[in-house]
């Protein structure tokens, strides 16, 4: 499977935003990201990409 869990990095700590994400789409308006998981749930997050760990299946936002 190619899903990843998305975390928000604040003050050096990672907080889970959504599990099983398979769509990660930056919005045209800077600073927002649309996430969709394997269950069809969507979330619009006010954050930007920090980094991606393919080995750990993690997407880190800031």
Predicted segments, located by residue:
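Compact, glycine-rich, soluble single-domain proteins
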Residues: 2-10, 15-62
